Amino acid sequence: LWNYAILPMGETPEKDDGQILVPFAVESSLSGVGKRLGDRNELWYNRTFTVSPKWNGKRVLLHFGAVDWKADVWVNGVCVGTHTGGFTPFEFDITAALKKGDNELKVRVWDPTDAGCQPRGKQVNRPEGIWYTPVSGIWQTVWLEAVPQQYIRNIRTTPDLDRKLFRVETAACGAQPGDVIEVRLYDNGTKVAEGRALSGAPVE
């Protein structure tokens, strides 16, 4: 359970309204709240968490599966990032904001629903005909991940059947000039291809 508060835009909570079960939207009864947010209010979440001593020396990433719609995130009072968009996952490197013991996580969410210009599907503030309510706030899983100081953040693969090639593009964090990315392609445990390229360049 997380703590939550609903306040007019621009105001900061001095106390919580109650608790909310994440990752259910605040409008959902499954969240334990079942309240409408509206485009003139903001939804605040807060909770504490600890980081395992086994993660010392590693980078710590805070992942959100999805938050509808605009999210601002703080760890121990430090703004670690902002994300806009209700349907895509995102993460922030929160290593520099962490401390020993309890860490405080705060998330501020604004969701104008049909008062804004974002894609919203069937979500409307005043449903008629169908009773599909807005889906505001954290509605997918939130989790922490420990990664090495150098790690691959994302991989994009593109097969080229005409040229009999397999193109791999990587986004490496913490890579140094001259670092090499090496890719091996296996088919049922048998290596069928391999390639090397400098970090930032595609491997074919």
Question: Locations of the language-model features?
Answer:
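Predominantly extracellular/luminal regions of secreted and cell-surface proteins
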Residues: L1-L21
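Accessory beta-strand-rich segments of carbohydrate-active enzymes
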Residues: A5-M9, K35-I152, A175, N188-V192, ...
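Hydrophobic beta-strand residues in large extracellular and virion-surface proteins
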Residues: I20, L62, L105-V107, V168, ...
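Beta-strand-rich binding/interaction modules
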Residues: V75, L165-L198, V203-E204
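Ser/Thr- and Asn-enriched, surface-exposed coil loops between beta-strands
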Residues: G86, T158-K164, S199-A201
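Surface beta-strand/loop "capping" patches
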Residues: A146-Q176
